[in-house]
Amino acid sequence: IQLQNLPQNHLPDLREARELVKTGNYEAMEFLYDDIPDTLSQLIRTAFVPREGMKFIVADFSAIEARVLSHLAKEEWRSEVFKNNGDIYCASASAMFGVPVEKHGVNAHLRQKGKIAELALGYGGSVGALTVMGALEMGLTEDELQPLVDSWRSANPNIVQFWWAVDRCVKKTIKERIDTETHGIHFYYKSGMLFIELPSGRRLSYVKPKMGVNKFGSESVVYEGVGGTKKWEQIESYGPKFVENIVQAISRDILAYAMRTLSHCFICGHVHDELIIECSEDVSLDAICEQMGRTPPWIPGLLLRADGYECDFYKKD
């Protein structure tokens, strides 16, 4: 089963709706809920239950990609936000607009701009990425989009530098067939493949890399792989996209490390950065989150945090 593809649950009375279905009270269902198919789809997750006398602990990392990206790029103000358990969306808006921003306080209206900028712009995204992320539907105007991109990049110069440092390393490695390194990431060419070695020692591989020209007439990297059409084809990439690959791969390695530190637990599922653990009622949620949030020895200084909740059936909190 692909847990990540299950519909999310937003019903405020999820438990009550679940009980109605369990007891077969379909008349009450029809009376209480306008959209029965939607209600039933939201209950699919709740079909997964722990054994008798057990519970689920569902824990995930807090903003893991943003933390890894900030750490690799050495964007210190962001790492300071994470160190103090701050709100990265507020902090980002504050850095972008030069004013204090509080979630439910001063300049709270700017937090939404900080949020969409964080979600859309970390890997080289621009106006198009903001639009795809729903910026216009959130109330932003088209005239605000480019200034938002410019503000985010000005507030995060080290991340921007990281994108293009990776871009230079990849191109130099492909062109000259030599090893390069930046920000603790090692790049090398071997047997017709580009390899990117991560801090964990794991490698990303790109088949038959070469230099090409993108639709804007600029130099770009091209390699072979499974594209959006699910067919083997030529794939174009560049620095920020490679950074996305690197950050997401490191985030995956951190999850794998957490699973090993929690190997004494019964991990019955994991989705993206989330672990689903079946355990006895006396197991502490805080203890699980503390263990999950431990930094692997191969990436010292990275600040991690895990949060979670307990439930007697699977759901999104």
Predicted regions and their residues:
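Conserved catalytic core of nucleotide polymerization and phosphodiester-bond processing enzymes
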Residues: 1-317
